[in-house]
Amino acid sequence: MLYFNMVNSLVLIICLIGFSFPQIQYDGNPQFFDNSYLDIDYIQIDQNNIIDREFHPMVFQFGHEYDVNIDFIKEATLIKEDDKSIYLLGIESSGAYAIGINFNEFYLSQNSKLFFYDEEKSFYIGSFDHRNNKPTQSLTTSLIKSDRIIIELSIPSYELNEIKLNIDTIIHDYTDINNYFTTLNSNREDCNINVICDEGDDWRDQIDGVIRVQMGGGLCSASIINNTANDRTPYVLFADHCVMGGASGYVFYFNYQSNTCNGTSGSLNQSISGSSVLAQEDLNSGPDFALLQITSDIPDSYNPFYVGWS
């Protein structure tokens, strides 16, 4: 849910639960999504290779991160169809409610398409294509609800030498964040009010400026901020205590709010992956802030509000 605090005259979004669709995505459908049986191997994630993240107590940690080194093209099953190559790779993280994928090498060719879906084929995210390439050559996906997922790459065979896809981190959701705010957990937030409620009417612009940030297996909130040039540079005002791991792997979610005043989850179908840290000062020596810049422009369709100088 999203909440606001009238006492501080600021909109605060408690970035909580749900499963998302991808970062900026494009047209296309996975070729084997409707195939009832796929004979592919699954890479079993070694959960001994956990990455030790010491999140600040004010960060909501929902998942573990596991260190891997998976060369997608090398490990995937290849299916040839005329002049097209289709690669399928299964990944299993036993006991996970959902899995996220971080690529430390990510570069797609002009005509390639990449998809992610659960083993049950209940939904997919994608396509990702060359427009998702970044100067950092990295990308983090949103969460796919299953402990067994499939990654599908479709590419013209003549473009194979252009591809770079290497996975270095698996995010393992151990809290079932999609169902986190059930009766068991919801009592802790009973004093808060969803921003969709009437009490938020005077704060609609500021609500559109607050976003959810996923840092590996942790969640925080942040604000999009403007600058005196008013040029829509995607600056993000963040808390330094939330900075954890590489900012290039952060996922930013926009318009995460319930459709009803008593709802317990929000839409996560608008997101962007990747950022850099421009400045920061910690809680002990200063105001506990970090200034980030998202590495992609925020689409107008997200209806972003840049707080300050607007």
Whereabouts are the PLM-identified features?
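N-terminal secretory signal peptides that target proteins for export/translocation
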Residues: 1-6
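Sec-dependent N-terminal signal peptides
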Residues: 7-22
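A short aromatic-anchored loop/beta-hairpin motif
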Residues: 23-93, 172-191, 195-197
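Extended extracellular/luminal ectodomain segments enriched in beta-structured repeat modules
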Residues: 93-100
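Short, surface-exposed beta-strand/strand-loop-strand elements in extracellular ectodomains
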Residues: 108-122
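Beta-sandwich interaction modules
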Residues: 122-148, 155-159
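Serine endopeptidase catalytic core focused on the charge-relay Asp
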Residues: 144-219, 227-310
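Phosphate-binding active sites in nucleotide-utilizing proteins
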Residues: 222
